[in-house]
Amino acid sequence: MPLADFHRSDPFTLGIELELQVVNPPGYDLSQDASTLIADVQHELTVGEAKHDITESMLEIATGVCRDISHAQIQLSAIQQAVQRAALRHHLQICGGGSHPFHAWQRQQISDNPRYVKTVEHFGYLAQQATVFGQHVHVGCQSGDDAIYLLHGLSRFVPHFIALNAASPWFDSTDSRFACSRLNRFSSYPDNGPMPWVADWQGFRRLFRQLSYTSMIDSMKDLHWDIRPSPQFGTVEVRVMDTPLTLAQAIHIAGFIQTLACWLLTERPFKHQPDDYLLYPFNRYQACRYGLDGTLTDVRSGEQRSIRQEILQLADRLAPFAHQLKATAALEAVVRQAKSPHSEAQQMRDFIANGGSLSGLVQKHCEIWAA
């Protein structure tokens, strides 16, 4: 399939996707009933969409194109409430979080979709192990060249995005010791991590043509990079975050990404180079392992500081752009989060340490999502 022309979008418009867990009380294991909910909820949706992901325990909700985070919040809230009503009708529950703490990947049913069937044929058991749950954020761009500049700029902040939403410490009934274990599920994929270096949209067209010509991919959907351009939507899509436990957190991280995008494309503070990515996997690992306490190393100076310190130092620089986008509340929430020692991952560990069960943890997450 040829690469679509880059669709010109209004700059800094937003789209948000959330992959949610469909669970089956009273045991709170993952259900295999996403298709039932999706079919039931369609007639209620007036904005956005609810759709399949790769397995039947995953339900994805997505906004349309949104002007700002308030617009996105209204859309997501309406979809959330419609899905909640459908779940109640079928005696199911919904929750966030990047991973289910005790599900068996072997029991996950692949959704009835030709693309997902092909994915299983290609990736085997890795596809079922990818029953993990993430948030994606699209930011509108006016041109392909803007999209490539923005992609490289946002790549500098991948550890920040991972750490802010890290909510997957438990996997296979075990404390992984990671704040975000979800991304480890993709480490065997050949396109895991950052996009190969290109300098501009013409370079990206050459890259896509080469990958297509060598039969590595059929379309953009076959590329699972941490951040990727989406020419058909005219966006850059950030794909590294766990689905958070609350809709509010999903909105806050989207507003933070939108604000960073506005700053990056307005001020052009960086001259991007291939060497920018030299320490990318190391800094990304720190965010997955330690969350906001992870240590970032500057690729040129060797200076080190924590992710939470970097966020706090960025805040003043970003404040005027957040105001311009009506995202000040989101930036302020991210700053409060960076100052707080109580991460979602640590709160999950504390729940278990205080005598809670893994099924009780999922039940709590369902209550949080429904609140």
Curated annotation (Swiss-Prot):
Reaction(s) the record says it catalyses: L-cysteine + L-glutamate + ATP = gamma-L-glutamyl-L-cysteine + ADP + phosphate + H(+)
GO molecular function terms noted in the UniProt entry: ATP binding; glutamate-cysteine ligase activity
InterPro entries, per the entry: GCL_type2/YbdK_subfam (IPR050141), GCS2 (IPR006336), Gln_synth/guanido_kin_cat_dom (IPR014746), YbdK (IPR011793)
EC number: 6.3.2.2
Keyword Transferase attached: no
Gene3D superfamilies membership: 3.30.590.20
Keywords of the record: ATP-binding, Ligase, Nucleotide-binding
One Gene Ontology biological process: modified amino acid biosynthetic process
Membership in a protein family: Belongs to the glutamate--cysteine ligase type 2 family. YbdK subfamily.
HAMAP family noted in UniProt: Glu_cys_ligase_2
Functional note: ATP-dependent carboxylate-amine ligase which exhibits weak glutamate--cysteine ligase activity.
Protein name: Putative glutamate--cysteine ligase 2
